[in-house]
Amino acid sequence: EIPRQKKHISLIFHKNRLLSVGRNCFKTHPKAKEIGYAYEEMHSELDAYRKLPHKYRGLKLTLVNVRFNRFRQLRMSRPCELCTPWCLEVFDAIYYTDNDGIKRME
């Protein structure tokens, strides 16, 4: 259970193998401060990436972001304006949910 109203989950894959899972959380992190996140709290993308074993960094990685509301309905989970630049550098493909399903970030 994620103790937040907006529940974001980030999954990192390499060749269809799940390598890391992250969630938005109240925990602070120095990298979150460097990126400029409000209150220095980690977004799900950063949480997943920091948990990714170092041996996989630099490989072709896919990020999948999912968000759901309290009724477990899919909602918009596109990376925010602070996450997008570094995610585009790190991931070869980025997918996210919206109210209608899943989309690929272009």
PLM regions with names:
Residues 1-8:
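Short, basic/aromatic recognition patches
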Residues 20-106:
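Zn2+-dependent cytidine deaminase-like catalytic core
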Residues 13-19:
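Short, glycine-anchored, charge-dense loop/turn motifs used at functional sites
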Residues 8-11, 94:
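Generic short beta-strand
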